[in-house]
Amino acid sequence: MTMIQYPLYENPYGDIRVDADTVIGLHMFTAGENDLASYVTSFSPFAVKLQTYFRMFGIRHERVSEQTNAVGPRHKIPFISVGNTLITDSGLIIDHLKTVLGDPDAHLTPAQKALGRMVQGALEDHLYWIILYYEFFSDSGWDFLSNVMVGGATNLPAEIQEALDLRRADFRKRCYDQGIARFTEAEIIDKAKRDMAAIDVLIDNKRFLLGDDRPTSHDAVVFGFTQAFFQVRDMHPEITDFVRTLPNLGRFIATVTTRWYPELKLAFEPHQP
Ligand SMILES: N[C@@H](CCC(=O)N[C@@H](CS)C(=O)NCC(=O)O)C(=O)O
């Protein structure tokens, strides 16, 4: 049997020069123009993570709103451009920028770095699938989101509706193949609650995941993957109602939103410290 040969894009790090004055193109899916855009910057957690990293650490950039992942060098969004050169993957981009613009994690102890890495793994490889489940697999999540984004899939021209249906079917299959869609919704809700309750414990009474005085790259990850659970209740009401009872993670979402996303509104009342 012949195996499919998948293309592999190598990031051309050697072809870009970035310094403090460089304006980097940040290509991402944005929330679009709708009621939810006042509460979240994007429904893509990797995009929110990268944009938050850029804002937290003052990296000059201009946002480019992409409509399809096909334009990404690995067919994934987000990616960055410096001139015509493209670098992909939020994690690889952050790693590279740390080497050329300074590393906001340099002061962390090995144990803190290890903890940050494990939290990142849980969010990007576990909680992410729950996000996809609500965006694509669940009828209620899909109906809610497509209503907000395009005013309901049934109002669209037939060919666009068909393209959306195909995309949804593709992501539903991925959710089933990965395994998340083999759990009941009650089990999925429980999994999401446990991930975020664990982060709440780890933040404790600090301002950020790993300290009180300044954020690290891990805070951009936490914000990217948990913001919508706090801000967009109608996608997943049971999860949102639970996470809004978490005092430390809720305070964290409020801190990051007010400090780095002054244009956004908070959809919930954070607990007072
Ligand atoms: N590891 C990548 C993941 C990016 C990713 O999965 N992006 C999603 C949007 S949230 C995407 O482009 N999906 C399109 C697809 O998989 O077809 C990163 O950190 O940038």
What are these regions (language model features)?
Residues 49-56, 96, 191-202, 255:
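Amphipathic alpha-helical segments that form well-ordered structural scaffolds
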Residues 2-162, 230:
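GST-like domain detector, emphasizing the conserved glutathione-binding G-site
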